[in-house]
């Protein structure tokens, strides 16, 4: 049973998708630069407003250079980061009895997506693989830099502009 889906994609009006690059790792965090209309002062003069930059939760779907394929799913941006840490191993298959039962149930074949991971990773013996563990060890991961960029939403550039405006 095949079903067609319609999904909104492409640029959004009044804004532009941008990517903020990491400084420590080869990462790109999707952001949206939203253009603002000018403020009209009490005397009728227009004051231009700087664009506002926010984290873009739309994923690659609003990137005009990305081809959407719902059956393939989203790009697995963390996959290489995890592999590069070399503290996990990839299993040969699903490890839970429930997961294996679902995988072997042919009546569910019509519901499956080709991108579903059937070879999950687990920590190597003696290793811990949580972001909290890495942080306590003083290790900064690509995930941490990604979140820092996402949450700061270019606040450093805003501070710089404010200081310049104030003559500091």
Q: Positions of the model-derived regions?
A:
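Non-catalytic terminal accessory/regulatory regions of metabolic enzymes
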Residues: 1-168
């Amino acid at each position: 049973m095949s079903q067609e889906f319609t999904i909104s994609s492409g640029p959004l009006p009044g804004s532009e998708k941008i990517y903020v690059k990491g400084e420590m790792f080869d990462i790109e965090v999707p952001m949206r630069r939203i253009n603002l209309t000018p403020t009209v002062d009490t005397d009728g003069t227009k004051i231009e407003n700087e664009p506002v930059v926010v984290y873009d939760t739309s994923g690659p779907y609003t990137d005009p250079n990305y081809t959407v394929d719902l059956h393939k799913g989203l790009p697995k941006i963390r996959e290489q980061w995890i592999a590069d840490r070399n503290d996990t191993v990839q299993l040969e298959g699903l490890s839970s009895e429930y997961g294996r039962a679902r995988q072997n149930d042919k009546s569910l074949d019509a519901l499956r997506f080709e991108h579903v991971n059937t070879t999950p990773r687990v920590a190597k013996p003696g290793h811990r693989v949580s972001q909290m563990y890495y942080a306590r060890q003083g290790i900064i991961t690509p995930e941490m830099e990604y979140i820092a960029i996402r949450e700061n939403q270019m606040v450093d550039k805003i501070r710089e502009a404010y200081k310049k405006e104030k003559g500091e």
